From Swiss-Prot:
Species this chain originates from: Mus musculus
Gene3D superfamilies documented for this protein: 6.10.250.1650, Erythroid Transcription Factor GATA-1, subunit A (3.30.50.10)
Lineage per the UniProt record: Eukaryota, Metazoa, Chordata, Craniata, Vertebrata
GO cellular component: chromosome, telomeric region; nuclear speck; nucleus; NuRD complex
Renumbered residue ranges of the record's region CR1: 166-191
Protein name in the entry: Transcriptional repressor p66-beta
Gene: Gatad2b
């Protein structure tokens, strides 16, 4: 059946292509009329099928009542296929030839037999096509024929020149429409680019605010963490903390370390805080604070910012030592040092200046716009920016020039030398570009030169911003160095210390002796470097205002005092540093929590 349907469809298409236009219109009218009749027939058959199905469902239950003549239900069929049930009370007098009152309803219009009805009933799987029925391919072919006829009528009664002029005019109109299409496309692209820039601006600002700290700023974060292994000389930048909190110990270690450690400051605290530090000596304080100070001594950046860091660290160590010394065992010395508040102010001002400089650099970098990309190529036809389309246009121009040259005198044509790219020496490109200096470049070389120029301009802007920030940082460091050079750092006057006082001080510092063999195994490299710093450090004294005394001098830190006592002083320094090393349990807890 499907095969017959396809053959019938092909035959109908062939017949329609051979029919004239008038016959087609008549056939269309006939087809519409036949389709109307077929639709009415189908509606009637559907109504009959519905009535028959309903009768089969209800009539067997009502057969006894029909014989009695009570409660008989019937169905009246209308032409539009609707069914209306009614009883005996609604029935009118019997119409002769249509239906009997005492019998069930009989449809007199159903004269066809069952095989005929089954054959004429439309099946959902079979499409019946008549010879006069049109199809969709026919409508499209009809439109093409009409357009072809219109195009032929356009050229009727015109000469060759008039036809060429008309073709040229139509070609110009086509190019204008193509140019308008390109313009609309570019306008749409520019609108989309503006929307994307507006949406991406906050994201770029949020991402640029997370900038890694500069090396100069990292130098201010030297006092942060215990080294993870003895061979570690430097400190990684991600493990450093700023000096804004002025505290060495993290809040996570508060439960494991003594409460007195929270008052130990890297930058020298005020005298009111030092009043709580005086009292009986506690060895745990000295041992636990040393790991947080050793990295600051071993970490020496190239800039001069390490000078105030070492000075504040040594002053903090001296304050810890002064808490172990009895007031009556040392003579007074009149040798004032710069106050801790001045040193803390200098360090704070330096850190604040570098932080402000870093923020200014970040702001400057955010203000520098990224290199603007060149206009994107439009990869659709027709487009003046598409190379393939330009190739076709050029080929069309060449063919047109050849056609024009055949009908004219060849001598009148001008000969033009072909262009050659001054950079890549090629002689073929969709677009030739001429620079201001007269050089002719191909499209590829011109695009690459534009990209290089934009990238170089952006790189120069970034370079200028970094150079300016570096110069400002150097000026700040020089100013701080000059201020540090003006302040006195040494005390010339030294008082004599008796032998008994030295022995008492020695016993005071060694309150918790430990075996030297076990302690020397755990000495980190930073402790050894601090030992060398103490051996080379000039003679320093603690101001008396910190300890409630006119002046206290730590003479055993200077190896030049008393040549005959040099070995004993070196031993004392080594023993003092060994006492400052924390127990293994505390160091492991600190490193584990960090």
């Amino acid at each position: 059946m499907d095969r017959m349907t396809e053959d019938a469809l092909r035959l109908n298409l062939l017949k329609r292509s051979l029919d004239p236009a008038d016959e087609r219109d008549d056939v269309l009218a006939k087809r519409l009329k036949m389709e109307g009749h077929e639709a009415m027939e189908r509606l009637k058959m559907l109504a009959l099928l519905k009535r028959k199905d309903l009768a089969n469902l209800e009539v067997p239950h009502e057969l006894p009542t029909k014989q009695d003549g009570s409660g008989v239900k019937g169905y009246e069929e209308k032409l539009n296929g609707n069914l209306r049930p009614h009883g005996d009370n609604n029935r009118t007098a019997g119409r002769p030839g249509k239906e009997n009152i005492n019998d069930e309803p009989v449809d007199m219009s159903a004269r066809r037999s069952e095989p005929d009805r089954g054959r004429l009933t439309p099946s959902p799987d079979i499409i019946v096509l008549s010879d006069n029925e049109a199809s969709s391919p026919r409508s499209s072919s009809r439109m093409e024929e009409r357009l072809k006829a219109a195009n032929l009528e356009m050229f009727k009664g015109k000469g060759m020149e008039e036809r060429q002029q008309l073709i040229k005019q139509l070609r110009d109109e086509l190019r204008l429409e193509e140019a308008r299409l390109v313009l609309l496309k570019k306008l749409r692209q520019s609108q989309l680019q503006k929307e994307n820039v507006v949406q991406k601006t906050p994201v770029v600002q949020n991402a640029a605010s997370i900038v890694q700290p500069s090396p100069a700023h990292v130098g201010q974060q030297g006092l942060s963490k215990l080294p993870s292994r003895p061979g570690a000389q430097g400190i990684e930048p991600q493990n450093m903390r700023t000096l804004q909190g002025h505290s060495v110990i993290r809040s996570a270690t508060n439960t494991t370390l003594p409460h007195m450690l929270m008052s130990q400051r890297v930058i020298a605290p005020n005298p009111a805080q030092l009043q709580g530090q005086r009292g009986p000596p506690k060895p745990g304080i000295v041992r636990t604070t040393t790991p947080n100070m050793n990295p600051a001594i071993s970490y020496q950046p190239q800039s001069s910012s390490s000078v105030p860091c070492q000075r504040t660290t040594s002053s903090a160590i001296y304050m810890n030592l002064a808490s172990h010394i009895q007031p009556g065992t040392v003579n007074r010395v009149s040798s004032p040092l710069p106050s801790p508040s001045a040193m803390s102010d200098a360090a704070n001002s330096q850190a604040a200046a570098k932080l402000a400089l870093r923020k200014q650099l970040e702001k400057t970098l955010l203000e520098i716009p990224p290199p603007k990309p060149p206009a994107p190529l439009l990869h659709f036809l027709p487009s003046a920016a598409n190379s393939e389309f330009i190739y076709m246009v050029g080929l069309e121009e060449v063919v047109q020039s050849v056609i024009d040259s055949q009908g004219k005198n060849c001598a009148s044509l001008l000969r033009v030398e072909p262009f050659v790219c001054a950079q890549c020496r090629t002689d073929f490109t969709p677009h030739w570009k001429q620079e201001k200096n007269g050089k002719i470049l191909c499209e590829q070389c011109m695009t690459s030169n534009q990209k290089k120029a934009l990238k170089a301009e952006h790189t120069n802007r970034l370079k200028n911003a970094f150079v300016k920030a570096l110069q400002q940082e150097q000026e700040i460091e020089q100013r701080l160095q000059q201020q540090a050079a003006l302040s006195p750092t040494t005390a010339p006057a030294v008082s004599s210390v008796s032998k008994q006082e030295t022995i008492m001080r020695h016993h005071t510092l060694r309150q918790a002796p430990q075996p030297q063999s076990s302690l020397q195994r755990g000495i980190p490299t930073s402790a050894r470097s601090m030992l060398s710093n103490f051996a080379q450090a000039p003679q320093l004294s603690v101001p008396g205002g910190l300890l409630g005394m006119p002046g206290v001098n730590i003479a055993y830190l200077n190896t030049g005092i008393g040549g005959h006592k040099a070995p004993s002083l070196a031993d004392r320094q080594r023993e003092y540093l060994l006492d400052m090393i924390p127990p293994r349990s505390i160091s492991q807890s600190i490193s584990g929590q960090k």
